[in-house]
Amino acid sequence: MAARFLLLGLAAVLAAPLGAQASDRPAADARSQVCATHAGATVLAAWSPAMPAPQRAAWIDAKRLRWAAPATAESVVLALAPTPSIVAREGAALDGAAQRLALTRVPSPGDVDRRFSHVAGDVFALDAALPATAWQGAMLVVALDAEGRVLDATGIQIAGALDAAFAPAARDAALGARIEGGITRFALWAPTASKIDLCLFDAPGEAAAEATGVQVRAMTVDAASGVWTHAVDADLRGRRYAFLVDVVVPGVGLVRNRVTDPYSLGLNADSRESVVLDLDDPATQPKGWASDRRPDTVQGHTDMVIHELHVRDFSRDDATVPEAHRGKYLAFTHPDTAGMRHLRALADAGLTDIHLLPTYDLATVPERDCVSPRRPADAAAANDALQAAIGAVRERDCYNWGYDPWHFDVPEGSYATNPDDAALRVREFRAMVQALHAAGLRVGLDVVYNHTFESGQGRQSVLDRIVPGYYHRLNAEGAVETSTCCANTATEATMMAKLMIESAVIWARDYRIDSFRFDLMGHQPKAAMLELQRAVDAATGRRIHLLGEGWNFGEVQNGARFAQAAQGVLNGTGIATFSDRMRDAARGGRAGDRGEALHAQGWLSGLHHAPNAANAGRPRAETEAELRQAEALIRVGLAGTLVDFETFDADGVIKPLSEFRYGDGPAGYVSQPGEVVNYTENHDNLTLFDSNALRLPLDTPLHERARVQVLGNALVLLAQGVGYLHAGQELMRSKSLDRNSFNSGDAFNFVDWTGARSAFGIGLPPAWDNEDSWPQMRPVLERAAELTPRAEDAAFVNEWTKALLRIRRDEPLLRLDTRDAVRAALRFHAVDGEPGLVIGELDGRALPPTHPAHGRRLAYALNTDPRTRSSLVATLAGETWTRHPELRPLEATGGSVEAPRDARLGDARLDANGRLSIPGRSVAVFVTDDTFRR
């Protein structure tokens, strides 16, 4: 049974702000000193050693919490104190609490959603909601016996309460620093803070706060929203600022944290201070920004073909770029460089979008004084010298992919020519966008809202030092979940969702970003992503295309906390997810393979038809069955991974793709073709060339490896859905077998847009992610002299890729935008003999007369068998078929490095009797005479 009691004088105590004691406050000059210390923290009152720090209870709303209290408890109380000084030792009396509020066990209501399912126990309720000031101090839930002794006690996860008590009034608040009518307004959401001061630095633009004076201005809180504000009757653009936040940090104490603004629009170098910016200021805009227009190349998702690119990779080693701009945003503004000529050629062929790896302010690259390691004199193709040199400086060097968010709304400073100039960062980023638009390419951003680089009191933690325990997803003990790699954010929390959505709006509206790729999107709620879609569309007046990694894992797996933005769950939303079905079937094995698993072969890499040494002794019947299974998943991918598209499986049985199996789940999982992203390579894991280097037989010659690369690219470009290519995939890019080059420096991430040089064989890949696979990698790298792609090999793949891009651009049959159109037009044909040959037919005669593909007919064949294959397809008989006109330049005799030729292509035929013949390791696209004339 639960007892109730009130502490005498409770009403009077609640009327005073918790933590408002004057003795806790240092003098103003001391606060100025804290202002001048980046990520400074002063403990005002230490955490009591007798106060439990874990948080095994969770607020459901502002009145109810869930906790597994001991069954023998006579009463359960909420203990409150202005500082973390509560003494709750098991077997002793509860002490140090300024207030005790009775909690009553109540039936578990139906509205306790999945968000709190990670915390077990019963539901307890207060009689009345706490006043706003109660959330500013320390609190415990305590179970007492009949004599008032502590049986158990724990901290309480606070997000549910803050969402109920403050978020309704705060969700529409304008946060950050804004200039309105000559007045600069600062706003920060921090409902658990007991005091906040604004640090306003006297001089703009300086890197070192210590060099100038600072004003400390008290901010005022709105009790309903928890938003702290301060207005200055002046236009403060260019001025640096920070906040001093007095807040209780579990396990640490009442702390004064010096933090930057999570809603910063500008920063100085290394994110020491936030900078007041107006994104409409001409100083933030390159010349011609007002007239910038995105290319009108994409009407729907399926028109998109994306090239995934890292800003530094693009130009760091391009000697045609001015030295000061190499590795910078401004490299894209030089149209006559090797990189821009290459991108423009891809755009002319049909590439629609560049997707940039993270470009927000990231935590892992010094924006000043980064170092670049020298290549050791003894570095060789198969030794560890180069990776050791990189490893010695990798935490201080100039390279990282950037999946380490620090501030979400500010361009990364290491890509700017002067990271201390906040307006310049913005101007140079916009100049990059403008230059890509002028080259015929839309611009997408890879965004990472699923985690931050640090949490808690870490130096590069921001959110958790302002509202501890709110912005990050917690486990059953109250520790931050890290399944993404780092500190998982809780986008199911109202104000974290607000931050994510408003951040995306800033990039789409103010930087004219055309699409977004969401890293680990499955860790975000579907509802938040739908709200984000509505917000970016409304802010820009156009459709902003969203796609992301819909992987299902971690603490949110299978909807444990909410309906995820994951594969299958997003059906019907128009938000696309990457598909691993065709990717794994084509490459062999699974993403992240290590050791002997790197020899597992797939449809592209020699399964059954070209066994490598590890697979040479396997029974042919076994490998043929595996190839049939892989080929079934190839058809799944080519058909857009649609749930209800029907074709034959590995056993020849006609069934919907939802009944094809991929691991433990369905292979087909989307409801519309625009909801799937097809790829065979991206920044993660081995490049396609490197994967094939490990999986194909070692004696496979380079010209055959080039043909396999073309087949891998063809799978992407002939498939229904969104096409996705990794930068350099069209040039046989290698990372010298590095499976995870996020922190491997410039050398392993090298790309040469002319194709003349390759990173293959520069050395064993870095030990920190690859050493367990060195025994499998070393023999391959030892043959670098014969396996390193040559200029002619890269050119062959590049010209083939551009031809396939042109075919996709010109053929609406390859970009069908509805499930009904795909179901009506596409069919696959069974082939004679062994698997290894895929024949697809697209017949536009089945489409409505108003459809742009109506009446057109197209067939394609993909042969992964090294031998010539032929098959009779009765339904293709009775027509005059010809190879697609865009393939003719590749058929011509002769050839050179600049204009390579495919000597086998002329042998690809589809005759009027329906007899199709295609050379080994080849792709061909055929159209009818009538289609050609249209």
Where are these regions (language model features)?
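Loop/helix patches that line or flank the sugar-binding groove of alpha-linked glycan CAZymes
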Residues: 659-859, 864-883
